[in-house]
Amino acid sequence: NAQYNKNPTILNHVQWFQPSLGWSSGPTALRMACEKGFKHIYILGFDYQGHVVNPNTKAAKLNNIFGDTRNYKKRTDEATFYGNWMNQTKRCLADFKEIKFYRVCPEGAFKPKDLEWNENLGHMNTKEFVELFKLTQRPT
């Protein structure tokens, strides 16, 4: 990216994974939180499948806050297959067994069977998360 050449010293403050993981942004953020030594990590925004628009075919549309922005898919586009994100999440769960992970998602949300093997992952609905941390939730 030519923008990095405008101020090359900015990259002096970047901590690169060694070796490079080549991961997506969400699992990379999860990995960074793991490496900080937290005992409990709450995972938000990992829906894995997007918004299901047809329960019969399980067709799903993009569900991402960056949808319709520059260099990103349209909100009307089909959801991206979540296999890579799933594998990257599973790697974090396996590599950091001492951490308790809580995946926060709406009531009745998709729960991937691929994550159920792990004893250090639990699911929490959004209401429980809001109550646990005494947060104020804006109306949708």
Label for each model-derived stretch:
Residues 1-140:
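Metal-ion/cofactor- or nucleotide/acyl-coenzyme-handling active-site neighborhoods
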